[in-house]
Amino acid sequence: MIGNRSLSVIDPNAVLHVEEEESMSAKSRLEGILLQLMKVEKAHTSSDASRQYYVDLHKDRFSDILRLCQFYVANPSARVLDIGRSELTAYLLKYYPHVTTLGLDLHADAGGHREASSMETVPHITFDLLNSHRVDIWPKCKSFELIVFSEVLEHLSVAPEFVFAFLNSLLAENGILICTTPNAADVAKRLRLAYGRNPFERLRLYSANPGHIREYTRQELCDIACSVGLQCIRQLYFDWPQSRGGSRIKSACMKLIRAYPPFRGSSVAVFRRVMP
């Protein structure tokens, strides 16, 4: 007894229990925040609405790529491989009946670029391009006269040499590979950088549908593909997709600036197999 008051004995286990409860409560709140952020992101990038928006926005790209394919591989009976099943596959099927797709498991793939058309009869090779560095597990299949590799490369977090080497292994002799990808040196990105804004996409929360991990310049594409036995026979630029809405004056100015091809938003490279 000190001054007629007894000393309280604090139980350290009780204090620890309270701290653990507070910590768990904080973690639960943060988990809820992250889940909500992911939900919003998935609605924007991976929902049925976002899929249809993507299809509508990229119709011109699909048509242009089909024309480019027809120019380099005119034979409609050619064996064609489309990397990453999407609505582009449906466009290719309009001319080439023998189209196969390659990519993630169709039942597990929740990406926002998936097809809107029915394609149950189209053959599919299940292979994750992130495993391209594993030469021992490359799928064994027939060769293809034409491979379409459109708007996929920028989503991959693996050295592109592995991917291009894998695709080279699937090409028939003198086969054609058409690659399209965002132009890392697009004038819009240059302007954003000049204003102190990061021109490239942030890493996404929903890893099943990654955004753009790495974009490439025209010269990079050529150097990478040529290093693994492909010959670049043509490079060109397109302005895909055409922006919607916004100021007419701004749109007119951007159209004028992008009359200079290297300032356009999309880079296209056509490769031929020269090394078995």
What are these regions (language model features)?
Residues 99-105:
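Conserved SAM-binding motif I beta-strand of class I
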Residues 81, 104, 150, 182:
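Active-site flanking residues adjacent to catalytic metal/cofactor-binding acidic residues
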Residues 79, 100, 143-145, 176:
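Structural signature of beta-strand start/N-cap positions in the alpha/beta core
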